[in-house]
Amino acid sequence: MLELLLQPFNYNYMVKAIWVSAIVGAVCAFLSAYLMLKGWSLMGDALSHSVVPGVAGAYALGFPYAAGAFFTGMLAALAMTLVRHITRLREDAIIGFIFSTFFAVGLLIVSLNPTSVNVQSIIFGNILGIADEDVLQVEIIILVSFVILCLIWKDLLAVFFDESHAMSIGLSPLRLKILFFTLLSACTVAALQTVGAILVIAMVVTPGATAYLLTDRFGRLLIIAIAIGAITSAFGAYLSFYLDGATGGVIVTLQTLVFLPAFFFAPKHGLLATRYRTRLKRRHPPVHLPEDNL
């Protein structure tokens, strides 16, 4: 029995897949906590699709896909940030416009160069076939991103919670947002290898959403989100060996299975707890004393 459980670790490609999935899942979860705080989950979706033209263009021109993905991801992030600052358009309109534009350009490039673009790798990822140089590239991206996030997490919290207060204490919201989106773009590029462009959104939303239901303290939220992201990603890669299924699909399914109990049974913000409090308020409405009795 033990030999069967340890069997995936006998294969170098599985060890690499589990390791890379764990570190990518951890840092994506770190970022997801801020996306939940700001209500920017759609931003993660937009960035995950905005890297498609970069990947497709890099494949078509023979350049490293990571460089192309990072370039278009950063371009999309900067466009969304700057357009928000110089126009009166709502954020959801800006995100929807840029998301659809970049994804359309990516599909156009794929249609023009169908033989030079590995569409399946873009959409579903290819973590089991990741090369050693790609592992090193992902490790560098994740390490740099994690160190920067650990250094500025309180500054980002101030900006995402209250920009006016952040400015009053000498922080630059615009610069910190650009830095955040730079890190988000870099981690999106890393996550492409793990789950592909379509499912990246789950890795930068689900862990943070789950943790958001379980605690009101941001420090704890970060720890819970990172733990969920790392464990589900590593175990998903491990489990995919036995299921013989898409690694990205297994990872995201596991994250959803962790989210659902929190959604229903979280002690304070779960669906059942919320409904219970609502019923109590209906049965025992607050008593308002007349002003003469105060």
UniProtKB/Swiss-Prot annotation:
GO cellular component, one term: plasma membrane
Protein keywords: Cell inner membrane, Cell membrane, Ion transport, Iron, Iron transport, Membrane, Transmembrane, Transmembrane helix, Transport
The keyword Nucleotide-binding is assigned to this record: no
Pfam families the record matches: ABC-3
TM ranges: 17-37, 51-71, 93-113, 140-160, 169-189, 194-214, 221-241, 246-266
Main location: membrane
Origin superkingdom: Bacteria
Compartments in which it is found: Cell inner membrane
Protein's GO biological process: cellular response to iron ion; iron ion transport; response to zinc ion; transmembrane transport
Membrane topology: Multi-pass membrane protein
Cysteine pairs bridged by disulfides in the record: none
Coiled coil: none
InterPro entries on file: ABC_BtuC-like (IPR037294), ABC_TroCD (IPR001626)
Keyword Cell inner membrane: yes
Task performed by this protein: Part of an ATP-driven transport system YfeABC for chelated iron.
Sequence similarity: Belongs to the ABC-3 integral membrane protein family.
Stated name of the protein: Chelated iron transport system membrane protein YfeC
Species of provenance: Yersinia pestis
Lineage of the species this protein comes from: Bacteria, Pseudomonadati, Pseudomonadota, Gammaproteobacteria, Enterobacterales
Gene name of the encoded protein: yfeC
